Regions:
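IMPase-like, lithium-sensitive Mg2+-dependent phosphomonoesterase catalytic core
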Residues: 2-53, 60-62, 73-339
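Alpha-helical scaffold segments that form or flank carboxylate-/histidine-based iron centers
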Residues: 66-69
Length: 339
């Protein structure tokens, strides 16, 4: 079979990007390739999850107070394993772990990056065949090289991210990552076992016709959010609509669709969860970085997500994220509450 050499693989693309910086060490390229390897391994297990004993609970509760799925454990071990045995990551923080882990060895202590990740977002949906995903975020350490990383290396504002991305395991497996140079998407080609560049220079449309929110919690939301949702429902062709509501319950899938097609995703505070439910470091920051690089916006309803300085590893947040024009329309409603 002839391979189309006009399509770059993930490895080739990251090397090409590195060559634009004469003094680059290649550590970030290596780290991204390591994450690509973990994604391939997780993809294999996701695709056969219904055939082997990997569905269901692992009999554990994670730091979030949630039942840990067997596939969560597998995915967490795969991401942690490739980063630990690579040469570019000094330590990791995972949604599934109580605390960060410093890879305290001579090579890792001299690495300049730390990685935060949600190993398997939406795993509660896998037994009904809904797309799920992995989310990751890369920061440059702030402590001196040559020693183990510490908590301050992880408690950084999202604006300090060097790269962020996600993998969606669906009808095809796709890896999307952003640096300050742009957002690019790679689809796993099963014929060669490589992620190949399929969506170069992704731009989030300024407007879309999709809004994503859990309508089941409508009466728990603050009034400005309720008002905006009702406006979305009432949009007509004359007012830029009609809008359609799409909410899968798998954050990676919802945000991937809205990034490509244009739209807005909302996870507001509720009476039960006044601080929000999503994890700032593992979910909000990575997607805020990706969407902003692509031309969109992300806030917690009051301030820009990327400006929030975290005080704990598992800090929660509300999230409003998506197309710039739709976000600005939403903000006009939220500002009434904050005025």
């Amino acid at each position: 079979m002839m391979v189309n050499r006009k399509i770059l693989t993930l490895d080739e693309f990251t090397i090409q990007q590195m060559r634009a910086f004469p003094h680059a060490t290649g550590e970030l390229s290596n780290l991204l390739r390591d994450l690509g390897l973990a994604a391939k391994r997780i993809n294999v297990e996701v695709n056969k999850a219904g055939l082997v004993d990997i569905l269901g609970d692992a009999g554990e509760i994670n730091v979030q107070g949630e039942d840990v799925k067997k596939l969560d454990v597998y995915a967490n071990n795969q991401v942690m394993g490739v980063l630990k045995h690579g040469i570019s990551c000094a330590g990791i923080g995972s949604e599934e772990l109580d605390d960060f882990i410093a890879f305290d060895d001579p090579v890792s202590n001299n690495s300049k990056y730390v990685c935060m990740f949600d190993p398997l977002d939406g795993s509660g949906n896998i037994d009904v065949n809904v797309s799920i995903g992995t989310i990751f975020s890369v920061y440059r350490r702030v402590t001196p090289k040559g020693q183990p990383v510490s908590r301050e290396d992880f408690l950084q504002a999202g604006i300090n991210q060097v790269a962020a991305g996600y993998i969606v395991y669906g009808s095809s497996t796709m890896l999307v990552y952003a640096t300050r140079r742009g957002v690019n998407g790679f689809t796993l080609d099963p014929s060669i076992g490589e992620f190949s560049l399929s969506h170069p220079n992704i731009q989030c449309p300024e407007f879309g016709k999709i809004y994503s929110v859990n309508h089941g919690n409508f009466f728990q939301y603050e009034k400005p959010v309720q008002d905006y949702i009702q406006v979305c429902q009432q949009k007509t062709k004359e007012t830029g609509g009609p809008y359609t509501q799409r909410y899968i319950g798998s954050m990676v899938s919802d945000l991937h669709r809205n990034l490509i097609k244009g739209g807005i995703f909302m996870y507001p505070a509720t009476k039960d969860k006044p601080k929000g439910k999503l994890r700032l470091l593992y979910e909000c920051n990575p997607f805020a970085f990706i969407v902003e690089v692509a031309g969109g916006k992300a806030t917690n309803g009051k301030v820009r997500i990327l400006d929030i300085v975290p005080t704990e590893l598992h800090q929660r947040s509300t999230l409003f994220i998506g197309s710039k024009g739709m976000m600005e329309e939403l903000e006009s409603f939220l500002q009434r509450e904050n005025a």
